[in-house]
């Protein structure tokens, strides 16, 4: 899956939604949050028509045994400013993680989407920025909803730093939580590569439904007790003290989702 992001090279939002290329973070923002539904898959093609078994990137069954997510990441900075990167992976059936909140002021292509596909490249490795943007963020309601559910307590009362906050495991099924420090130790920036394997090894039952002779396909999990739920990947970046708008971080990825069908 190719990297797509809703950020510009400045770290600001793209005016017309996600585009192909790295995700960018500005040092002026205390925290920048990206989120992605890694298991979002329909049984229909982006351009219309049903998926077939010869299309390896498409699912053709409502129940899939998810093996895991493989990802090769490249992170680079343009200055010696240090960064903290926290990755959290979790499973959930809560619709607040996959739907845009009506309270957002964003509209059209700038509205929150938990995954992105198009007719050329199919499903993408999306980095959708929910926070930051130098005060121009228009997905505040969705951002608050997601983080209120994910973390224990309230920001500013029970915690301040999202890279230190405890995940609320009563509300989500935590699968992975790791903090990585990015620092050059000299006057140059850093360029580092990471390989991540996130195992799942559970069934995912998609919320498909019949409509006469037509099967209405959903990209998301059912809300009942069947299956593991949607597998979400959240990346949080925080700059070190003294960072400014001139300090930038870029992240790109090549990702693959593996599953078996029943």
Q: Can you say where each PLM-predicted feature lies in the sequence?
A:
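Low-complexity, serine/threonine/proline-enriched polar segments
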Residues: 101-198
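N-terminal onset of structured domains
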Residues: 39-135
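Eukaryote-biased detector of low-complexity, proline/serine/threonine-rich segments
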Residues: 63-66, 188-236
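Exposed low-complexity, polar/acidic, P/S/T/G-rich flexible segments that act as propeptides
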Residues: 223-262
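N-terminal leader/pro-regions and domain N-caps
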Residues: 1-53
